Amino acid sequence: MTSLVLEPTSTALWQALVSDAEAAANRQLDETLESYLVLTLMRFTQRPELVSSVMALEFLDSAQKAGQQQHAQLRDVGDKCLLVSGLFPQNAKRRLVSIGYFVNMGRSAYQQLHDKIHGFYGQLAADFIPMMDVLHAMRELNDQSQHIDLLDAFELWEETGSQHALERVKDGSSGGHMIKRDWIDGADTSH
């Protein structure tokens, strides 16, 4: 008698990683957002050049296109910005812009797409920050050195209201860094 051994699919592995990251970030994405994030991660692994493009030019170029071509380009810009802001925040530093720059561009791309074709792109724009927080937690799951640095976390929290960045600031500020702990504890977290 032969036994059947089922290998987990890459979709199942990504799903498990996203679920673990949600728990680590103390964020619960709804099923639609979770599925979209898994599919975006799967698509990225097949096209790693996605994050090396100049997204601002692609975003501007999308205005010159129409129909499906424009929709695909706006989706790609939103997805790339999500991945850069969540998985590769160090790329923002290399490009001499804040992580919030990619957040704002990604949210704008998704919102424009929603304005054109509706669907769930409005939800992607609205929940960009929680998805980014999950991706930050994903980076940190196996390597705590993957935290964004304290000043970048402070800037990200201040610009976007990222709860994960705020936790990073709180954790870092308790270690004697120069950010005033009483100011952080009293900060408005309702972004």
What do these predicted ranges mean?
Residues 1-191:
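Polar/charged low-complexity regulatory segments
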